[in-house]
Amino acid sequence: EYHKNILLEAIGEYPLITISRKSVNLGTNIVDTEPQSHFNMYRQILRASKLVTTPFVATAESDTLYPKEHFNFYRPPVDAVSYDMSRWSLYTWNPVFSLKRRISNCTLIASREYLIDALEERYGENSKCPPERVGEVGRHIHEKALGITLRNAIEVWCDVPTIQVNHENGTNYREAHHPKRKRLGEIKATEI
Protein backbone atom coordinates (compact mmCIF):
# COMPACT_ATOMS: atom_id res chain seq x y z
CA GLU A 1 0.00 0.00 0.00
CA TYR A 2 2.83 2.40 0.87
CA HIS A 3 4.61 1.79 -2.47
CA LYS A 4 1.34 2.27 -4.34
CA ASN A 5 0.67 5.62 -2.65
CA ILE A 6 4.21 6.85 -3.34
CA LEU A 7 3.88 5.87 -7.01
CA LEU A 8 0.47 7.51 -7.43
CA GLU A 9 1.77 10.71 -5.87
CA ALA A 10 4.85 10.64 -8.11
CA ILE A 11 3.03 10.09 -11.42
CA GLY A 12 0.40 12.72 -10.73
CA GLU A 13 -2.02 12.97 -13.67
CA TYR A 14 -0.12 10.60 -15.97
CA PRO A 15 -2.13 7.51 -16.97
CA LEU A 16 -1.11 4.23 -15.34
CA ILE A 17 -1.02 0.74 -16.84
CA THR A 18 -0.33 -2.00 -14.29
CA ILE A 19 0.85 -5.54 -14.89
CA SER A 20 0.11 -7.94 -12.06
CA ARG A 21 -0.31 -11.62 -11.23
CA LYS A 22 -3.83 -11.00 -9.90
CA SER A 23 -6.40 -8.46 -11.01
CA VAL A 24 -5.95 -5.11 -9.27
CA ASN A 25 -8.03 -1.97 -9.41
CA LEU A 26 -5.17 0.36 -10.29
CA GLY A 27 -5.12 2.12 -13.65
CA THR A 28 -5.56 -0.09 -16.70
CA ASN A 29 -4.66 -3.55 -15.41
CA ILE A 30 -3.09 -6.40 -17.39
CA VAL A 31 -3.13 -9.78 -15.65
CA ASP A 32 0.06 -11.72 -16.41
CA THR A 33 -0.46 -15.48 -16.45
CA GLU A 34 2.91 -16.46 -17.92
CA PRO A 35 5.75 -17.99 -15.84
CA GLN A 36 7.77 -15.34 -14.02
CA SER A 37 11.07 -14.64 -15.80
CA HIS A 38 13.07 -11.79 -17.25
CA PHE A 39 11.96 -12.78 -20.77
CA ASN A 40 8.31 -12.59 -19.72
CA MET A 41 8.90 -9.26 -17.98
CA TYR A 42 10.04 -7.75 -21.28
CA ARG A 43 7.09 -9.28 -23.12
CA GLN A 44 4.75 -7.68 -20.59
CA ILE A 45 6.47 -4.29 -20.99
CA LEU A 46 5.88 -4.64 -24.74
CA ARG A 47 2.26 -5.60 -24.17
CA ALA A 48 1.66 -2.59 -21.91
CA SER A 49 3.55 -0.18 -24.19
CA LYS A 50 1.14 -0.99 -27.01
CA LEU A 51 -1.73 0.23 -24.80
CA VAL A 52 -0.05 3.53 -23.95
CA THR A 53 -1.74 6.60 -25.45
CA THR A 54 0.98 9.13 -24.58
CA PRO A 55 4.09 9.84 -26.71
CA PHE A 56 6.42 8.55 -23.97
CA VAL A 57 6.52 5.47 -21.74
CA ALA A 58 8.00 5.40 -18.24
CA THR A 59 8.35 2.02 -16.57
CA ALA A 60 7.89 1.68 -12.82
CA GLU A 61 8.45 -1.33 -10.61
CA SER A 62 6.54 -2.19 -7.46
CA ASP A 63 9.74 -2.48 -5.42
CA THR A 64 11.05 0.97 -6.34
CA LEU A 65 10.16 4.27 -4.68
CA TYR A 66 9.90 7.20 -7.09
CA PRO A 67 9.96 10.94 -6.46
CA LYS A 68 7.66 13.02 -8.68
CA GLU A 69 10.76 14.62 -10.21
CA HIS A 70 11.70 11.30 -11.82
CA PHE A 71 8.69 11.37 -14.14
CA ASN A 72 9.02 15.04 -15.06
CA PHE A 73 12.65 16.11 -15.31
CA TYR A 74 13.63 14.65 -18.70
CA ARG A 75 12.35 13.28 -22.00
CA PRO A 76 14.78 11.61 -24.41
CA PRO A 77 14.78 12.29 -28.14
CA VAL A 78 12.39 10.06 -30.09
CA ASP A 79 15.28 7.87 -31.29
CA ALA A 80 16.63 6.95 -27.85
CA VAL A 81 15.71 5.52 -24.48
CA SER A 82 16.86 7.09 -21.23
CA TYR A 83 17.75 5.67 -17.84
CA ASP A 84 17.86 7.72 -14.64
CA MET A 85 21.15 6.76 -13.01
CA SER A 86 20.37 8.42 -9.67
CA ARG A 87 19.06 5.14 -8.25
CA TRP A 88 20.04 3.97 -4.81
CA SER A 89 19.79 0.22 -4.28
CA LEU A 90 18.75 -1.21 -0.93
CA TYR A 91 19.37 -4.92 -0.33
CA THR A 92 17.15 -6.65 2.22
CA TRP A 93 20.02 -9.00 3.13
CA ASN A 94 22.65 -6.26 3.58
CA PRO A 95 22.57 -3.11 5.77
CA VAL A 96 24.42 -1.02 3.15
CA PHE A 97 22.82 1.05 0.36
CA SER A 98 24.68 1.58 -2.89
CA LEU A 99 24.65 3.57 -6.09
CA LYS A 100 25.98 1.81 -9.15
CA ARG A 101 26.46 2.88 -12.73
CA ARG A 102 24.21 0.34 -14.37
CA ILE A 103 21.08 0.99 -16.35
CA SER A 104 17.86 -0.55 -15.05
CA ASN A 105 14.37 -0.92 -16.44
CA CYS A 106 12.96 0.54 -13.25
CA THR A 107 14.10 4.00 -14.43
CA LEU A 108 13.43 3.67 -18.17
CA ILE A 109 11.75 6.55 -20.02
CA ALA A 110 11.41 6.26 -23.80
CA SER A 111 9.49 7.33 -26.83
CA ARG A 112 6.56 4.91 -27.09
CA GLU A 113 7.20 4.05 -30.75
CA TYR A 114 10.95 3.60 -30.30
CA LEU A 115 10.45 1.33 -27.31
CA ILE A 116 7.82 -0.78 -29.05
CA ASP A 117 10.08 -1.19 -32.10
CA ALA A 118 13.01 -2.28 -29.92
CA LEU A 119 10.91 -4.71 -27.85
CA GLU A 120 9.18 -6.19 -30.91
CA GLU A 121 12.56 -6.99 -32.43
CA ARG A 122 13.61 -8.79 -29.23
CA TYR A 123 10.43 -10.25 -27.76
CA GLY A 124 7.67 -9.97 -30.35
CA GLU A 125 5.90 -12.93 -31.94
CA ASN A 126 8.47 -13.16 -34.77
CA SER A 127 11.56 -12.67 -32.62
CA LYS A 128 14.35 -15.20 -32.86
CA CYS A 129 15.98 -14.06 -29.61
CA PRO A 130 16.45 -16.87 -27.07
CA PRO A 131 14.51 -16.47 -23.80
CA GLU A 132 17.64 -16.89 -21.70
CA ARG A 133 19.39 -13.87 -23.28
CA VAL A 134 17.76 -10.65 -22.09
CA GLY A 135 18.90 -7.14 -21.29
CA GLU A 136 17.82 -3.54 -21.22
CA VAL A 137 17.12 -1.67 -24.45
CA GLY A 138 20.31 0.20 -25.35
CA ARG A 139 22.59 -2.21 -23.48
CA HIS A 140 24.88 -2.96 -26.40
CA ILE A 141 26.55 -6.05 -24.95
CA HIS A 142 23.21 -7.85 -25.23
CA GLU A 143 22.18 -6.27 -28.52
CA LYS A 144 25.47 -7.28 -30.16
CA ALA A 145 25.23 -10.83 -28.80
CA LEU A 146 21.68 -11.13 -30.14
CA GLY A 147 22.57 -9.63 -33.52
CA ILE A 148 19.82 -7.02 -33.26
CA THR A 149 19.68 -3.27 -33.80
CA LEU A 150 21.93 -1.28 -31.48
CA ARG A 151 19.63 1.20 -29.73
CA ASN A 152 20.54 4.63 -28.43
CA ALA A 153 20.51 4.94 -24.65
CA ILE A 154 21.08 8.11 -22.67
CA GLU A 155 22.09 8.12 -19.01
CA VAL A 156 20.55 11.01 -17.07
CA TRP A 157 20.70 12.07 -13.43
CA CYS A 158 17.65 13.39 -11.59
CA ASP A 159 18.34 15.70 -8.64
CA VAL A 160 16.11 13.50 -6.45
CA PRO A 161 17.02 9.79 -6.56
CA THR A 162 14.81 6.72 -6.76
CA ILE A 163 15.24 3.93 -4.21
CA GLN A 164 15.15 0.36 -5.51
CA VAL A 165 14.53 -2.39 -2.95
CA ASN A 166 16.25 -5.66 -3.92
CA HIS A 167 14.63 -8.59 -2.15
CA GLU A 168 14.48 -12.38 -2.12
CA ASN A 169 11.12 -12.50 -3.96
CA GLY A 170 12.36 -10.48 -6.94
CA THR A 171 12.94 -11.94 -10.39
CA ASN A 172 16.61 -10.87 -10.28
CA TYR A 173 17.19 -12.78 -7.06
CA ARG A 174 15.63 -16.01 -8.30
CA GLU A 175 17.01 -16.03 -11.85
CA ALA A 176 20.60 -15.05 -11.09
CA HIS A 177 20.99 -16.85 -7.76
CA HIS A 178 21.51 -13.60 -5.90
CA PRO A 179 22.74 -12.29 -3.50
CA LYS A 180 26.04 -13.84 -4.67
CA ARG A 181 25.92 -11.94 -7.97
CA LYS A 182 24.07 -8.90 -6.64
CA ARG A 183 27.07 -6.81 -5.63
CA LEU A 184 27.09 -3.36 -4.12
CA GLY A 185 27.73 -0.41 -6.41
CA GLU A 186 30.69 1.93 -6.45
CA ILE A 187 29.21 4.42 -3.96
CA LYS A 188 28.06 3.00 -0.63
CA ALA A 189 26.18 4.42 2.35
CA THR A 190 24.70 3.19 5.59
CA GLU A 191 21.88 5.74 5.54
CA ILE A 192 20.24 7.96 2.96
Tell where the protein language model's regions lie, with residue ranges.
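Short, glycine/charged-enriched secondary-structure capping and boundary segments
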Residues: Y2-H3, G27-D32, N72-R75, V96-S98
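Short, well-formed alpha-helical segments that are part of the catalytic scaffolds
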Residues: E1-A10
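Conserved catalytic core of nucleotide-sugar-dependent glycosyltransferases
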Residues: F71-E191
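Short, hydrophobic beta-strand segments that form beta-sheet elements in well-ordered domains
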Residues: G12-K22, F56-A58, V81-Y83
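Conserved glycosyltransferase catalytic-site signature
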Residues: H38-I45, S62-T64, P130-V137
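Short beta-strand-to-loop acidic/aromatic patch adjacent to the donor-nucleotide binding site
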Residues: T54-P67
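Active-site-proximal specificity loops/subdomain of glycosyltransferases
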Residues: I17-P55, H70-N72
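Conserved protein kinase catalytic core
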Residues: L26, P67, L90
